Amino acid sequence: MTDGPVDWELARRLARKVAGDEPLSCSYLGDSLHEDFARFTPMAEELVAAETGLVSDEGSARARVIDRAGWIDANIRAFRRLLRPVLAESASTHPASVVTSKIAAAELGMVLGWMSRRVLGQYDLLLTEDEDRDDQDLVYYVGPNILSIEKKFAFDPKQFRLWLA
């Protein structure tokens, strides 16, 4: 069954299939990611505030180290929130067929899966009043991709992670 103009579950499954697995994601190398980004994100926020004068009224940034599937899930939630008003309006005038919802899901799933293999992090500021605040205003770090880039270019992990933050 479809959930309107986009079959969100199909998009999620396709994206995860395209994303694949990064071998380093299950290694001991990932153990320090959570600790490092918990320390470096507030540190980077202070450096930016000192340099620009920009200070968040909402408090300190919240960091979350996730895998590719987590990044896909977060972005599907964001797309659903962002597109909800447009899709609701469209549904009343142009009801979606099963075929169009599958095509939309395939397009979205392929793009998100491809992007999940390349993105290192993301600041998600999509705020809506009717959603859980713990799901919004986050800095995501895609752990497997960060580990892969560190290895590929022989970056010093601490320096690279602070730079990302």
Language model segments and positions:
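A metal-dependent hydrolase signature that marks the N-terminal structural subdomain at the beginning
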Residues: 1-116
